[in-house]
Amino acid sequence: MSVKEHHSTVGAIAEAVAEAAHGDLPGTKGHHPISAVIGTAITGGRQNAGTKGYLTAYLKQLETNPLRTKMLTAGTLAGSQELLASWLAKDRNKNGNYFTARVPKMATYGALVSAPLGHFLIWILQKMFQNRKSLRAKILQILVSNLIVAPIQNSVYLVAMAIIAGAKTWKQVQATVRVGFWKVMKVSWLSSPLCLAFAQKFLPEAAWMPFFNLVSFFIGTYINYITKKKRLAALRRKHFGDGAHGDHRHDRERERDRERERHSSPPHGHGPSHGGRPINPTLGSHHGGGPVPPPQDYPSLGQNPRY
């Protein structure tokens, strides 16, 4: 940068700060001019001054590039949901990290499957009831959403979750859908009418899908967290044979091992010895005057406990 350009930039910044100090910058009162200038610069510039910069920019992207924006939103939320649920449930991978292999898979599902499908279905739903604002039309829209749109989305979701979980055959996928379908539908039927009624009342149609994704993020994180906790508890029961208190069982096993070692070790000064030290009974006594082999500090305890 040349000296002339440097002075020009400094002058522009000083002028912007002075403008903000007098409250001339839209949305500012002059109390914190430097913060106002910085905040305006990073939230869209002067043309967006006085508006909610990030939200305005996001809604603008929803209008100009709806599918791309929804794909990025759904992918980010799905990956974040898996990561947050893993952290809450203390579900780590073999390297001890919460960023498991499911995180990028869930992000891919959200961006490439969930978002395009939801975009298409919500578009059809909105087209069916376009320019129909009566209470009857709104109730009918909620019914169509719950009886047609939700079953399609939930079925695709369960198929994707089965594949991500490692299902290899169509029968395994069918079993996953059969077991989980009505459970997921019950959650949808409880939350969807409220969310759709809220969207009908307060949100522009372009913002419906991101709003539904945000609600699904919180509900999905909770369900994912509960599922992970149950799976970890089942693994502990299988591994330790003692419900969710596997760590305590591990401690009790070690304590019993130490007690067994103390009772099994021959006391010093008793039994056959050489030089006041107990002789390893498996080696017998030594009459040849050679060095005494080291004692066996930990006698055999049979099979190791299951850890």
Curated annotation (Swiss-Prot):
Description of the deletion phenotype? Impairs the recruitment of hex-1 assemblies to the matrix face of the peroxisome membrane, and the subsequent production of Woronin bodies.
Its annotated compartments are: Peroxisome membrane; Cell septum
**Impact of mutating R102W?**
Leads to total defect in the production of asymmetrical nascent Woronin bodies and localizes uniformly in the peroxisome membrane
Q: Name one GO cellular component term.
A: Woronin body
Q: Which UniProt keywords apply?
A: Membrane, Peroxisome, Transmembrane, Transmembrane helix
Q: Where is the composition biased (Basic and acidic residues)?
A: 241-264
Q: What is its main location?
A: membrane
What are the TM regions of this chain, as residue ranges? 106-125, 146-167, 207-227
Low complexity bias: start-end ranges: 266-278
Q: Which domain of life is it from?
A: Eukaryota
Give the family per the record. Answer: Belongs to the peroxisomal membrane protein PXMP2/4 family.
PANTHER family cross-referenced by the UniProt entry: INTEGRAL MEMBRANE PROTEIN 25D9-6, PEROXISOMAL MEMBRANE PROTEIN 2, PXMP2 MPV17
Subunit structure, interactors included: Self-assembles into detergent-resistant oligomers and forms a complex with hex-1 assemblies.
| Name of the protein in question | Woronin sorting complex protein
User: Highest lineage ranks of the organism?
Assistant: Eukaryota, Fungi, Dikarya, Ascomycota, Pezizomycotina
Q: Which gene encodes it?
A: wsc
